[in-house]
Structures are given as C-alpha cells and as structure tokens.
Amino acid sequence: MKVTGITILFWPLSMILLSDKIQSSKREVQCNFTEKNYTLIPADIKKDVTILDLSYNQITLNGTDTRVLQTYFLLTELYLIENKVTILHNNGFGNLSSLEILNICRNSIYVIQQGAFLGLNKLKQLYLCQNKIEQLNADVFVPLRSLKLLNLQGNLISYLDVPPLFHLELITLYGNLWNCSCSLFNLQNWLNTSNVTLENENITMCSYPNSLQSYNIKTVPHKAECHSKFPSSVTEDLYIHFQPISNSIFNSSSNNLTRNSEHEPLGKSWAFLVGVVVTVLTTSLLIFIAIKCPIWYNILLSYNHHRLEEHEAETYEDGFTGNPSSLSQIPETNSEETTVIFEQLHSFVVDDDGFIEDKYIDIHELCEEN
C-alpha cells in the first residue's frame, strides 16, 4: 500500500517533468538579422538556433559561410532572401539534417551544383524563385526525399526533367522561358499524371515557339514524334533500391550529365574553341612555311648548280676523250708560224669593191707561187 501510494503521489510530478522536457525539446529559438548589411554569416549566433533569418544582406554563401552554417545543425528554417548568392556549392547545407524550409529567393543564383542539397533529407519547402537559373539537373533534387513544395518562379528555365520518386504536392513554375517543344514533354506528362498541383497554372505559359505562346505548359499539344521520342511513363522500379545519396555517387555524376545533354543544345563555346584551334594551327603553318621556304629554295638552287657543273664536266671529258686522234693529225709546225697563222686567221680587209678580203687566201696563193 505504501509503494502504491508513493507511486500515485509521484506520477503527476513525473508527467509534469516529462511534458516540460518535451516542450523544451520543441522550443523554437529565432534569430533575426535582416538588413544588417552582413557580408558573412555571423559565427556568434546561438548554437541552438532553429529559425535563422539573414535576408536583405550581402551574404554570398562562400566557403567561410558554409563552415559557419554547419555549426547551426538544429536549424529547421533558413531564410536568405535578397542576398548576393550566385552559386550553390556541393554540401553547402550538408550538416543541416533537420532543415525543413530553405528560402533563397531574389538572389543571382545561376549555378546549382550536383550535390548542393546533400543531407537535406527532411527538407519540405524549397524556394528558388527570382534567380537566374537557366537549367536544372534532375538529380539535384534526388536527396530531397521529403520535399513537398518547390518554387522556381521567375527564373530563365526553358525545360525541366523531373526525376522519378519526385512526390511534390505544389510546384510553381510561372515566369520562366518555357520551350514547349518535345523537350518539355516529360514535364508535361508528369504534371498531368502525378498528384502535384501547378500553382498559377493559367499564367504558366509557353515562350517558344511563337505558335504555342497562347498555351500553358500543362495543356500545350505535342506532335506525334514527341510521344515516340520520350516514353510516356517511367517506371519507379529503377529507383526501388536507391540508397541514400553520398559524396561518392555525386563524384560519378558525369554519366547523368551526359544523359541530360541529349536534350540540351550545345553552347557556342565549342564553336569558339574549334575556331581558335584552327586559327592557331593555320598561323603556325604559315610561319613555318615562311621560315623554311628560303632555306629550301637555297638548298634546291645549290643542288641544281652542283648538277649543272657535274654535267658540264662530264661533257668536256667525253668530248676530249672521244677524238684523241685529232691531236695526232695536226702537223708539227713552228711555233712562230702557228702564231702568225692564228693572227692572220682573224685579219680581214675590206676591198674596194665592198667585199671582205681574207688575207689567209692571199698568203696561201703566195706560197703556191713560190
């Protein structure tokens, strides 16, 4: 009886202590640092903060911000509206496993890396509105297994691939540059077959091509080839055995990027690179030719001269050796007579009648008379 009485007396007290403990565990700690002109996330905030509002500052979410943010692991809500964020880096929120709401609207985000949302297993609401996002890899959202709301309003997105097992309840897509060609077929099929609600459906319009600008992305008609190019449904069996995403999986993300690149137009950077390479090669070839041509010309000219000298020498030797008897037929004469005859051979006298008189003939006649 005494034990029962003691138990009855302490039971209300134990319940009160337990309720206080539960309430303390769910206690919200809010910190508001809006419009403070901060360039970095403060490192002296209470470590038990659960709701942190850093909107309207100059924060960029660089490496220092990421390290400081990891220390606030009890965060359930994080607001970074209208800051200077341009890139969402891998593992930028990796230690915030309790985060449920992330609002990064009205920044200048144009790159979201593959593992930007790693670790956010409990995230339910993601706001990326009014940024400069042009394309999103579908695998970026794979770690967000609890995501229910996605706001992509007011970006530069023209198409969006939706991953399997993406069980959203509300999505906002208006204010983008939607290209309602075949590349949008998968998104349209998902919007029409899933339980997701497209917010502001009537103003989520096509931007391209011009003939489809009067249609919203959920009801735009597609041609028959779009149905054959893109399967109408994707089975979820491929992802049944999907394990929690880790860093090693995202290190091999190049395969996924290759798959998505089939629907993406090639940028102008490749054409520019090819042009630069061709220009460099052509210029190098011209310089090489300009340097080597004079040398090659001199070598060729020298070779021709050498061949010409060899040919003349061979001709002279052939002529000299071909008529050896000619020298023996020459009669032996006095050197003086030879000299006189040589000189007389070239002595010509113009006669009175205009004819040239050769004195060699005269001398020969005189010799006969004598």
From Swiss-Prot:
Sorted UniProt keywords: Glycoprotein, Leucine-rich repeat, Membrane, Repeat, Signal, Transmembrane, Transmembrane helix
One annotated GO molecular function: signaling receptor activity
Signal peptide: 1-24
Gene3D superfamilies for the chain: Ribonuclease Inhibitor
Transmembrane parts of this sequence: 271-291
Extracellular side: 25-270
Entry protein name: Leucine-rich repeat-containing protein 19
Organism this protein belongs to: Homo sapiens (Human)
Name of the encoding gene: LRRC19
